[in-house]
Amino acid sequence: MPKRQDIETILVIGSGPIIIGQAAEFDYAGTQACLALKEEGYRVILVNSNPATIMTDNEIADKVYIEPLTHDFIARIIRKEQPDALLPTLGGQTGLNMAIQLHDSGELEANNVKLLGTELESIQQAEDRELFRTLMNDLGVPVPESDIVNTVEQAFAFKEEVGYPLIVRPAFTMGGTGGGICHNDAEFKEIVTNGLHYSPATQCLIEKSIAGFKEIEYEVMRDKNDNAIVVCNMENIDPVGIHTGDSIVVAPSQTLSDVEYQMLRDVSLKVIRALGIEGGCNVQLALDPHSLDYYIIEVNPRVSRSSALASKATGYPIAKLAAKIAIGLTLDEMLNPITETSYAAFEPTLDYVISKIPRFPFDKFEKGERVLGTQMKATGEVMAIGRTYEESLLKAIRSLEYGVHHLGLPNGETFDLGYIKERIQDQDDERLFFIGEAIRRGTTLEEIHEMTKIDYFFLNKFQHIIDIEHDLKSNKGDIDYLKFAKNYGFSDRVIAHRFDMTEEEVYDLRQQNGIIPVYKMVDTCAAEFESATPYYYGTYEYENESVVTEKEKILVLGSGPIRIGQGVEFDYATVHAVWAIQQAGYEAIIVNNNPETVSTDFSISDKLYFEPLTEEDVMNIIDLEQPKGVVVQFGGQTAINLADKLAKHDVKILGTSLEDLNRAEDRKEFEALLHTIDVPQPNGKTATSPQEALENARSIGYPVVVRPSYVLGGRAMEIVNSDAELEDYMNQAVKASPDHPVLVDRYLTGKEIEVDAISDGETVIIPGIMEHIERAGVHSGDSIAVYPPQTLKQEEMTTLEDFTIRLAKGLNIVGLINIQFVIAHDGVYVLEVNPRSSRTVPFLSKITNIQMAQLAMRAIIGDKLVDLGYQPGIQPYTEGVFVKAPVFSFNKLKNVDITLGPEMKSTGEVMGKDATMEKALFKGLTASGMEVKDHGTVLMTVSDKDKDEIVSIAQRLNEVGYRILATQGTARKLAENNIPSEVVGKIGGEDDLLTRIQNGEVQIVVNTMTKGKEFERDGFQIRRASVENGVPCLTSLDTVVALTRVIESMTFTMKNM
């Protein structure tokens, strides 16, 4: 069937900011889809609120709108652009929900916009729990015993019939938001209430729990001629009951018999045909391990996290082909881009095993609720490819960057067996490692199976890994056994530990005996057809399929899994660096292990190695490819931390030299440099023991900021106000990096400024300066950043420019540098310098139209900025005001305190742009998920130190018609200043403030309680209650002032005469 001729312009809705449950996989899918539609000759208009993505680059679509993803804003774009069609299935749940709202409001019909791909009725049939259940019953496909409810009372009526355990699944939500497993009335009431709140349709499915069944997924494609194929089937190692995004997944499935495989395949295809899906679709099934009984759990009628994984696991580009199916092409007329000889209608076959392991944020949120259930908690994931299951699992484990390299925890031997078993029963994020520890102690597989319901196939593989580990000890230095262990994915580091050698000695031993990996191609067809992809994985076999070319090569290190502090911004920079390398005529090679991102799309680089980012795995690739050099400054801290390890092997680090990278990180050397170039920094000292830290803090004077050196995203960084708080910190956090000392700095309150600059060693250019709304002390990744600065004086701007140039030249920067300054009452101070790409690079690149990562890469290759047409210093300003606002995923993480401080907590970001600061802020706040209303009720409860400042804010909010609720102390302060407020009861009393929040009476919460380390503190409960009830809670008064400005600009003030 030829493609549709009745449409010319297509609107694509992106997925917005990165949150838990909706991460970089949609940047990858959306980028692929937009390019596929352009390739077919359509005009593409993209709307997405996330500036950190490749998808929102001007090259990806004909017109890019970075605007809030709300009904009103998208409707404005539709009215302005008059697209012929809308493609809703590539923007995750956000894109789908938007399409449904635009359809229901009549906006699409009024503007003659057709929906492409899967019909809306089909989407609703798959997403609406009631309609889906009815269809399954008609098809004779079993679904778990369940009921659809719209109220808590209905839920309890169903519970009386079937009893616990029950699973609650809210309709039209993403990543299991608001859902969970319930074992008693209290849990049930809380989860159902939450679920109804988070579901846009106020609807939940309550189903009898089938936890313990195997969870199997089929990634399927169908076109309008009813051709349907299975791209990939995957098996969750964790049984049903843990969200698939939080499960360890293996592809292809390992434990299904042929009968089971075919039965579930047939069901998957039958269901997507009945639904009329056109494009990609994910089917989740539950299989009874003891019989052929199965249930269908759910169907995602869109591109999903699993389809990104399936694309990378097979090399089959699902999103690209789904976009082409949406415009009328069929599977039997599209070529598979990997082989370029076979058609897309051929099902991929794999001759390797892939493992996916989720990356959790609990290294940042140590007090977070770690137990896994039906609500997703992982921020990202890693994938690894091997020829055996053991190899792919161990490669995935060492890709996670938890400091864990093996099936066990670093301090595993210190735990007693009782504790280990308790942790296994908890089913939390560390369960896999505790299972390894239990096997080491001789716990039987039967007992572990009883506790976890994990299939014996996998438990036997874990046992095999522990057996090899054990035998390494008794075969110290044995070359054959070394080879055997390498076949099963053991790293040099783990072997070295068992052989009583250093990692270098094992590396040398391998080199001398020719035990080196070969690289195999991922070709979608198990080598049945000729294939032309440059997509490889390493394994210890005989034939190397990665042909080394004569061309000069540059190797770029990617940034690994998405986590808090290291998001998609670094993938963005990686991709741009690769494009610049190719333009300069070099061969670009990427090493990365994140299946969700654009950088691991095989069509981006000349060669992609899907491997762990460790010294050993990267060196193996360098030994084969012999690149001219390696680029580390685009891959975040992951890549920077590998620089010195690679340099030990005489690998050339391109761009800023290793000595200079270390000079920026090493406290003493950095202080010496600042002294030489005459740039001031807050008074600070270095401590190697708790005693020394106390002496330092007393001599500097409280408050002080304490942190370990060499960290990203402010990990383990805190502001402390007293000896007691400091002692508490030193006892908990110094472990954060034992070989590195702790820095103790004077905490300066003032405006925080962030600058990104590019240097070629001679000329320094500054694309832009950003001012933070929150004063220093809030991590730059969690602050609202504004471009251009709104409150800086000209002489401050000149000083910032001057200091930036001095720092870039003083550190001999070649490439990018990111600097944070604070402007205190007595001048400008430098807070920190990062000699690498930062998380603001995409944001500034989009605003200024200076492709910073590409320009930095050209400087690294040796081009001069002056020859490229740039003048030194601050570049000309772009018209308008641009705001970068953080986005948090607190509603997915229980027990996490949302107070902003020096430790980063946001998972993503959005951009708001308009002619004025207020309008840009309104867009930024709206895009971040905050509903900004021009009237309503604000609850204020602030600490003593903030009481003076809250008065003027309350005055302004009162004048635009906001009602004020306040706790006793705050209300007293307001009354002294003639500002009316209603006093609310303390927690636990009658009509207390938590009840007010839960009943939906409050639109904004302002809370700056003194920080108590213990959870029981009222402030913590207030903050959590607001998150769990979807009420914006602001913990920094600077953010409140910004919000007040926006509210004032939307409305009129009412003052009496």
UniProtKB/Swiss-Prot annotation:
Keyword terms of this UniProt record: Amino-acid biosynthesis, Arginine biosynthesis, ATP-binding, Ligase, Magnesium, Manganese, Metal-binding, Nucleotide-binding, Pyrimidine biosynthesis, Repeat
Chain spans, region Carboxyphosphate synthetic domain: 1-401
EC numbers, comma separated: 6.3.4.16, 6.3.5.5
Name of one Pfam family that matches: CPSase_L_D2
Record-listed Mg(2+) 4 binding positions: 832, 834
GO cellular component annotations of the record: cytoplasm
Pathway: Amino-acid biosynthesis; L-arginine biosynthesis; carbamoyl phosphate from bicarbonate: step 1/1; Pyrimidine metabolism; UMP biosynthesis via de novo pathway; (S)-dihydroorotate from bicarbonate: step 1/3
Record-listed ATP 2 binding positions: 707, 746, 748, 752, 777-780, 820, 832
The protein, known as: Carbamoyl phosphate synthase large chain
